[in-house]
Amino acid sequence: MLTKIFPVATLLIVFLSSSVYAQDEAAKIDKSRVPAQADSPEKFAPAGWKIEAQISGDLNGDRVPDYALKLVEAKPEKDADGDPTERGRALVIALANNNRLTRAGVADNLLQCTRCGGAFYGVVETPAEVTIEKGVIVVQQDHGSREVTNATYRFRYEPSTGQFLLIGFDLSNTDRATAQVTSESINYLTGAREEMRSKGEKDIKARSVIPRRKIYLDDISADDMESAAYKRLKL
């Protein structure tokens, strides 16, 4: 009888452990559950999500305030030990028109999760900053340990498609032990790229041109963008 109980108990432990682990992982938002239209910003957060930050500003040039909504999973912010939990994030863009808000973009692979900052942030919740500057959506976030990566993305409304186009990308990698900095800045409208490497008190800069291509907020992946930058910078 005991030989029959042990396998069942083992399976139950594995199942419960897997369930707990899945609950601790950051989730990815289901874009299909984000409404196409709503009468208030709060209604763009589907069940299981909430607004972490609400940034307003004119994004399409009609002089009417629009919204960049930073969403986060609606899970407890801290665990039993008082440490921040791992919660996924998403960015929703809503344009205002005739007292209604229309969804204009959802980024599910752009903002880093609340525990994705690495040893650099330790047990402090990892930020993901979103601002609107002169009609441009700016996303800035960093992570790492001894080496810290800082990435900045800039998106601007494209009237012909009704989408938000990546127009600029900056990435820097800083070795905190040696203070050496390697960085690049890309203008996706022109293809102009500038690379900079610090060596002692001297900065070495190089300019080049990359093939122009369109990357939209809905499709962008922060992991892919950073991996490509590391490859270009030979990090």
Question: What residues fall within each predicted segment?
Answer:
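Short glycine/acidic-enriched loop and turn motifs that connect beta-strands
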Residues: A74-E77, S145-R146
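Beta-propeller blade termini
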Residues: K50-L59, F120-K134
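Bacterial N-terminal signal peptides
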Residues: P7-S17
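Blade-edge motifs of beta-propeller repeat domains
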Residues: Q23-A47, N99-G122, Y216
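Acidic, small-residue rich beta-repeat scaffolds with periodic aromatic anchors
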Residues: A22-K28, V124-L235
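Acidic/hydrophobic-patterned starts of short beta strands in beta-sheet-rich repeat architectures
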Residues: L59-V72, T131-Q141
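Positively charged n-region of N-terminal signal peptides that target proteins for export
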Residues: M1-I5
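Beta-propeller blade repeat segments, especially FG-GAP/WD-type strand-to-loop junctions
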Residues: E77-D108, F155-R156
